[in-house]
Amino acid sequence: DSEGNKVFDYGEKRPFNGRTNNLATLIHDAVWNQTDNFNINVTAGTKFLRHFTFKVSGSADILNRRYTKMYNNKFGDAANVRGRGSVEALRIESLTFNQILNFNKELGLHNVSAMVGHESYRYVEKSVFAQRTGFPLEMSNDLVFGAQLEDGSSQTDEHAIEGWFGQVGYDYANRYYISGSYRRDGSSRFYKDSRWGDFWSVGASWRISQEAFMKNAKWMDNLKLKVSYGVQGNDNILDENKDPYYYAWQNFFEPYPNHDFGGVIHSTTGNRDLHWEKNTNFNVGLEFSFLNRIR
């Protein structure tokens, strides 16, 4: 124009791709993404009565994000609604807390160990989204200037696991080993009557390289035969989009307003019979290293 400002071709008279201008979009549309991520880990422990240790640990992972998009009112995808702006605010909290008691004792060639513990995990995700149209200015930086509310929503997802566990182990002369473990977990993804699952494992190993008949095999640093059998649990339920699904046991309702009156409609029927998926594992392995370098 006469003042030297760039005047873009909005393309009203083009036979195709009207009201688009890629260069103008880069200049007049805007996207802001602000993210804060905090990671905190705290550990404390003590040793007492010679053979006992107690450890407490906690961790927190907190994410805050604000994502803003503003599309101008002259050209591009939002020209027909005189500009469009949206803001999404997201907060995710992941908290883990552990308390573990260990016991270790040597009795000559005998070694005994035991461990009991408790773990709690909590995940909370909260989001708010708003979108407005009809902006009087070519470029606005806040939704308050939009005349019409096009979309407004919020969502909260929560997931919690509580677990108790224990393990015992014994070995003789650093040669023969046996161990057993047990764990009981409760997940918020299941109904209260089927929330808890029991999981366990047993194992044994034989360090062959410690036997007398191997004393001439100086090149063999370690040779161990291992076998284990156990049951593991899985509560990772997915929806039709393969995203985490936290409420499979609950009935779900969606908003269904009638003009100026609020309303809901039943969308999903929960399944209270869902429970932990259990996987049985049997493993046999040979662990070795020789020449002080090859494993």
Features from the language model and the residues they span:
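N-terminal, post-signal-peptide soluble/periplasmic segments
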Residues: 1-5
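Extracellular/periplasmic, surface-exposed regions of secreted and cell-surface proteins
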Residues: 11-71, 80-295
